[in-house]
């Protein structure tokens, strides 16, 4: 098998191509399941490498490397979708599409897995089994992973282990460092809520003839904060945030309704905290609405479970990343103390089906000029780390398959 040094050297030679892929994707961000240009770029690149890419689900792409020798199957995932965000990064290759931006680094992930595909194809005879390459849409809306699972992602051939990386910007870590978690729950579950308050609209000069849904919705929003501060166990992790509030179109019109949308995050595999939040949020919204002569509807959607990292696979990953990067690999528990984070990731659906490890790659810190974190309109990512990401994906696959021959 290729040595770590040779693999890093080969990956480094791909750097111009990796940056070209990434910057092309960055200029043309697409969101959700609507990724025609992104998907076309991925399939074209894979075909030129000698793969036969296959569609999976609404907009996913799969390709297989290896398979010439018997062995297990490892899945490498890169997500492809962008955010509905107006870019303010100042990059020369900034988004050319108003209101859309690769503000979470998925363009980086796609390029990294394409780089891994190139390296694996060049060393296909060394693969002791099969590597399944996954390019996933709709991670930002927590729907893409489940859609691909339901479309056969983990079958034909059946996946034995799964790996993903996520880049980090604006964190106090040198660019190019890989963080490996220790196992167990590492990320929170996530779901969305939508509260609609119905009143009776009319002229702003005659509130007495109306039933104002904005007033009711404002009081609902304030009342809901009692759940966070007074009802949830402070020793656990459960939080929700209303991030969007809309009502009316004109300043002199009381609207018929007001809407609130938000997110719920919990670290609770049994979903007891989620159930508590659901119950109390519904009771409070409907009760307060009634007090203000309104009615309220509360709905919950897009549930995504906690990310569960397989401990033996994580231990393998730390060993392999240390072999590849030396001190450039770090046990994440040294930073987190083993505590899960409040972020969410829909690859969690895969983690509940097969042993999974979710790692991180630092892509710039404040001292290096990368001041902002993910989902900020000014976030920037250091794409000089792309080759390390491609090498890490490749080495993880080669080493794990070699160590787990059937």
PLM regions with names:
Residues 83, 90-101, 108, 120-255, ...:
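Histidine/acidic-residue-rich, glycine-tolerant segments that coordinate divalent metal ions
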Residues 25, 76, 106, 133, ...:
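Divalent metal-coordination and catalytic microenvironments
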Residues 77, 86, 193-195, 358-364:
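Non-cysteine beta-strand/loop elements that form the S-adenosyl-L-methionine
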Residues 3, 14-21, 34-45, 72, ...:
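General structural feature for long, well-ordered alpha-helical segments within catalytic domains
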Residues 218-406:
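Metal-dependent amide/peptide-bond hydrolase catalytic core
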């Amino acid at each position: 098998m290729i040595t770590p040094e040779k693999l890093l050297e080969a990956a480094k030679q791909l750097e111009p191509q990796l940056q070209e892929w990434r910057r092309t994707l960055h200029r043309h961000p697409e969101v959700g399941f609507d990724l025609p240009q992104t998907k076309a770029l991925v399939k074209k690149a894979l075909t030129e490498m000698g793969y036969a890419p296959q569609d999976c689900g609404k907009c996913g792409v799969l390709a297989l490397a290896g398979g010439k020798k018997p062995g297990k199957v490892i899945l490498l995932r890169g997500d492809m979708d962008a955010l509905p965000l107006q870019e303010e990064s100042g990059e020369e290759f900034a988004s050319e599409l108003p209101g859309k931006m690769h503000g979470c680094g998925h363009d980086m992930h796609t390029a990294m897995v394409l780089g891994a595909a190139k390296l694996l194809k060049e060393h296909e005879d060394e693969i002791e089994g099969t590597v399944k390459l996954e390019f996933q849409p709709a991670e930002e809306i927590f729907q893409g992973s489940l859609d691909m699972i339901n479309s056969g992602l983990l079958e034909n051939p059946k996946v034995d282990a799964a790996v993903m990386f996520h880049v980090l910007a604006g964190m106090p870590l040198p660019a190019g460092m890989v963080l490996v978690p220790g196992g167990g729950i590492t990320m929170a579950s996530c779901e969305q809520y939508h509260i609609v308050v119905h009143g009776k609209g009319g002229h702003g000069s005659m509130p007495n003839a109306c039933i104002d849904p904005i007033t009711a919705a404002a009081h609902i929003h304030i009342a809901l904060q009692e759940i966070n501060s007074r009802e949830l166990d402070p020793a656990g992790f459960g939080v929700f945030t209303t991030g969007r509030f809309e009502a009316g179109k004109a300043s002199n019109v009381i609207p018929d309704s007001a809407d609130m949308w938000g997110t719920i995050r919990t670290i609770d595999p049994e979903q007891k905290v989620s159930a508590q939040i659901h119950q109390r949020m519904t009771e409070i919204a409907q009760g307060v609405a009634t007090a203000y002569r309104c009615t309220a509807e509360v709905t919950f959607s897009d549930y995504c479970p906690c990310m569960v990292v397989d401990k033996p696979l994580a231990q393998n990953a730390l060993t392999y990343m240390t072999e590849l990067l030396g001190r450039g690999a770090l046990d994440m528990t040294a930073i987190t103390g083993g505590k899960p984070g409040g972020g969410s990731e829909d690859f969690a659906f895969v983690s509940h089906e097969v042993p999974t490890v979710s790692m991180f790659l630092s892509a710039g810190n404040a001292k290096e000029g990368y001041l902002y974190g993910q989902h900020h309109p000014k976030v920037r990512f250091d794409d000089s780390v792309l080759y390390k990401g491609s090498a890490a994906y490749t080495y993880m696959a080669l080493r794990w398959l070699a160590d787990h021959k059937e």
